[in-house]
Amino acid sequence: MSQNFGKISQVIGAVIDVEFEPGKLPPIYQALRVTNPAIDDQEFNLVLEVAQHLGENAVRTIAMDSTDGLVRGQQVKDMGKQISVPVGKKTLGRILNVIGEPVDEMGPIGNEKEYGIHREAPLFVNQSTKVEAFTTGIKVVDLLAPYARGGKIGLFGGAGVGKTVLIMELINNIAKQHGGFSVFAGVGERTREGNDLWMEMKESGVLDKAALVYGQMNEPPGARARVALSALSIAEYFRDEEGQDVLLFVDNIFRFTQAGSEVSALLGRIPSAVGYQPTLATEMGELQERITSTNKGSITSVQAIYVPADDLTDPAPATAFAHLDATTVLSRQIAELGIYPAVDPLDSTSRILDPQVIGDEHYAIARQVQYVLQKYKDLQDIIAILGMDELSEEDKLVVARARKIQKFLSQPFHVAEAFTGSPGKYVELKDTIKGFSEIIAGKHDDLPEQAFYMVGTIEEAIEKAQKLAV
């Protein structure tokens, strides 16, 4: 097949119009390449993806890297296929960019197998319907909003409440305990955090079981809008061809939407609510429907979701909500109390918080914990106006237990050891259930509430109380 060439007719930021000869237009999602001397001295080093057909034998494309240095009339080569990334075991331990090139200066991937980044979601008949919980070792999550194996989990939170730290702790806990392969997509987040994660994984010895795909804040919107799809293709290969249970971490899914909205305006689409792209729900659906479990293997995904201005009704987080099996909501009020992870125990939900999945004992304790915390929340207005003395004896007891529960929901993290100075704790589910059932039963009413702060198991809280008493 003879090579198809076109030429640049217009450059508008990250969007480039290319003219072709009549009858030779590349289809939507096809990859094109052009030489940009501002990137490096390689030929055809900039990848474009066809987004629209404009008529007049022209296509509108989105650039995957910087367009500074491009000029009208430059030659563009049609690659004859969509953007493809290397897949398979050679990607493990490596950092790739959106087009599957290594960016860790450790030489080429040297892989023969590639997957396109736009793929169909698995058919209904091939999807798995098995439901089981998996343990993360984080008390508040395992007790109140447990994660499903092969499910989709969202970590919601505003700026600076600890989403990335929680994701890094989950990688640390699950990747070490789980033993399978992990894929991490860094979508429009800080490059420093990406670097920290790489170093962290290297030190803890889980790097050789993980593939990292980065398109960070400094990348153009085209790369940020596609990098999650590149990572997903790598995860799909492990699920479909190797029958693995894969973990997919995405930090941050909001940046995927944000990049889509940046590009959408340049493509000439009329914006919808709050200035987002009109195709918001479709784009989110195309990504999320591919993250699923089949009868060959599973993809369990944990996605950090930035909440603009702490408003959960913003279209970006609200659209993501519909796809999730469990939501872990991080709250600024709880972070201000110094309780980390700052998970809101009343706002966080899980589809599998159900006695048929997690058992009667776990379900009963979780509901009692939520009841006590809700009662405390309801009493806070009275306490603020009249003080604790005006409460009945029964309510005073509820408040005391609620404050202990609140403190006991905190936990020292392995990845934060350098900042907190206290060693991280992984708490088994049975220990979590035992601890909270004892607090609710009133076995530890005599201990000071400070004893429950930043400990793992209830035994550690008792030990801490003895030290405090000295």
From Swiss-Prot:
> Which cystines does this chain contain?
none
Q: Which PROSITE patterns match?
A: ATPASE_ALPHA_BETA (PS00152)
Q: Which CDD domains match?
A: ATP-synt_F1_beta_C, ATP-synt_F1_beta_N, F1-ATPase_beta_CD
Q: Where is the signal peptide?
A: none
Alphabetically ordered keywords of this record = ATP synthesis, ATP-binding, Cell inner membrane, Cell membrane, CF(1), Hydrogen ion transport, Ion transport, Membrane, Nucleotide-binding, Translocase, Transport
Which SUPFAM superfamilies does this entry report, sorted A to Z? C-terminal domain of alpha and beta subunits of F1 ATP synthase, N-terminal domain of alpha and beta subunits of F1 ATP synthase, P-loop containing nucleoside triphosphate hydrolases
Q: Write down the top EC class of this protein.
A: translocase
Localization, UniProt: Cell inner membrane
Q: Name one GO molecular function term.
A: ATP hydrolysis activity
Give yes or no: UniProt keyword Metal-binding: no
Annotated ATP binding sites: 157-164
Pfam families recorded: ATP-synt_ab (PF00006), ATP-synt_ab_N (PF02874), ATP-synt_VA_C (PF22919)
Write down the InterPro entries for this protein, in alphabetical order.
AAA+_ATPase, ATP-synt_VA_C, ATP_synth_F1_bsu, ATPase_a/bsu_AS, ATPase_alpha/beta_chains, ATPase_F1/V1/A1_a/bsu_N, ATPase_F1/V1/A1_a/bsu_N_sf, ATPase_F1/V1/A1_a/bsu_nucl-bd
Q: How does it sit in the membrane?
A: Peripheral membrane protein
Q: Does the keyword Membrane apply?
A: yes
Question: GO cellular component annotations, sorted alphabetically?
Answer: plasma membrane; proton-transporting ATP synthase complex
Question: Which coarse location class applies to the principal site listed for this UniProt protein?
Answer: membrane
Q: Which reaction does it catalyse?
A: ATP + H2O + 4 H(+)(in) = ADP + phosphate + 5 H(+)(out)
- Tell me which EC number(s) this protein carries: 7.1.2.2
Family the entry assigns: Belongs to the ATPase alpha/beta chains family.
- Biological role: Produces ATP from ADP in the presence of a proton gradient across the membrane. The catalytic sites are hosted primarily by the beta subunits.
Subunit-structure text: F-type ATPases have 2 components, CF(1) - the catalytic core - and CF(0) - the membrane proton channel. CF(1) has five subunits: alpha(3), beta(3), gamma(1), delta(1), epsilon(1). CF(0) has three main subunits: a(1), b(2) and c(9-12). The alpha and beta chains form an alternating ring which encloses part of the gamma chain. CF(1) is attached to CF(0) by a central stalk formed by the gamma and epsilon chains, while a peripheral stalk is formed by the delta and b chains.
Per its UniProt record, what HAMAP family does this chain match?
Answer: ATP_synth_beta_bact
This protein's name? ATP synthase subunit beta
